């Protein structure tokens, strides 16, 4: 226990944050299943939860919380060094790579794991720098979809035009799944080009050190949470908006170069 700085104590309340909760819940499930195997049915409803809590409590406080606390600290250190580096090129590279890879993570359902990292960063610094960059990924999809729309119009693919028309408003507001599963992912190439285009916006946002005080949808709706950062609220909101425009343009350009009219006609 650190008497001088209690918040730095290994056993302080909340140590490990979301990571500790996830791992603790996993342990609870495993132990509960084991207890339920040998517990008589007549006693199950009362004693199974009690025994499970007793068996989990001490290891959770003495092992899981401190261990995940160190992991959280390490993750925050890495994010801080990359996303908040004084070296501009480091922030640019980190922003581009993380944003370009975010769409594949969304498609595989792995992007929810980043929420834990958001929580860790918010708890430690009071703001999140990774979320504004990753929010650019959806804007790249919008640019890619617009490029495909014009090609679909040119080749007469009415079905694809209608799908894009219905999905674009949601994409502008940060809901990217209709565009992912209805347009870009089935065609493969636009899925890649959207990420490559969005990377430019992510690099810009990370370079300008845009920060958010919360997280939620991406796109235009995220403008309302870009209220932190070293340059002030107005700069964060403005730079985020510029980042969106960059993603729209670069997503359009990269997709226009990578996807042919024949690809759209056969979609």
Language-model-detected regions and their locations in the chain:
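Hydrophobic alpha-helical transmembrane segments
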Residues: 19, 46, 50, 92-97, ...
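Helix-loop-helix junctions within the multi-pass membrane cores of secondary transporters/permeases
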Residues: 115-198
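Interfacial loop-to-helix junctions that mark the boundaries of transmembrane helices
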Residues: 3-16, 40, 44, 83-87, ...
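Transmembrane alpha-helical segments and their short flanking loops
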Residues: 5, 88, 148, 155-156, ...
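Alpha-helical transmembrane segments and their membrane-interface boundaries
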Residues: 47, 55-59, 63-136
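Juxtamembrane interface elements at the cytosolic ends of transmembrane helices
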Residues: 22-40, 67-75, 113, 254, ...
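Early transmembrane hairpin of solute transport permeases
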Residues: 1-33, 203-208, 235
């Amino acid at each position: 226990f650190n008497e001088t700085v209690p918040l730095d104590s290994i056993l302080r309340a909340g140590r490990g944050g979301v990571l500790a909760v996830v791992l603790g819940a996993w342990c609870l499930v495993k132990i509960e299943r084991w207890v339920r195997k040998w517990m008589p049915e007549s006693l199950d409803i009362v004693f199974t939860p009690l025994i499970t809590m007793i068996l989990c409590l001490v290891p959770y406080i003495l092992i899981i919380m401190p261990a995940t606390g160190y992991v959280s600290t390490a993750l925050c250190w890495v994010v801080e060094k990359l996303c908040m580096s004084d070296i501009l090129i480091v922030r640019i590279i980190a922003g581009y790579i993380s944003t370009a890879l975010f769409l594949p993570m969304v498609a595989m359902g792995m992007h929810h794991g980043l929420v834990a990292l958001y929580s860790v960063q918010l708890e430690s610094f009071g703001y999140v720098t990774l979320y504004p960059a990753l929010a650019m990924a959806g804007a790249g999809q919008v640019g890619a979809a617009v490029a495909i729309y014009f090609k679909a119009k040119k080749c007469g693919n009415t079905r694809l035009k209608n799908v894009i028309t219905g999905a674009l408003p949601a994409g502008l507001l940060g809901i990217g799944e209709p565009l992912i599963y209805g347009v870009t992912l089935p065609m493969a190439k636009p899925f890649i080009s959207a990420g490559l285009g969005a990377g430019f916006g992510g690099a810009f946002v990370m370079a300008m050190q845009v920060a958010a005080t919360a997280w939620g949808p991406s796109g235009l709706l995220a403008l309302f949470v870009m209220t932190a950062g070293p340059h002030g609220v107005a700069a964060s909101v403005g730079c985020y908006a510029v980042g969106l425009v960059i993603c729209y343009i670069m997503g359009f350009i990269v997709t226009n170069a990578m996807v042919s009219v024949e690809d759209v006609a056969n979609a």
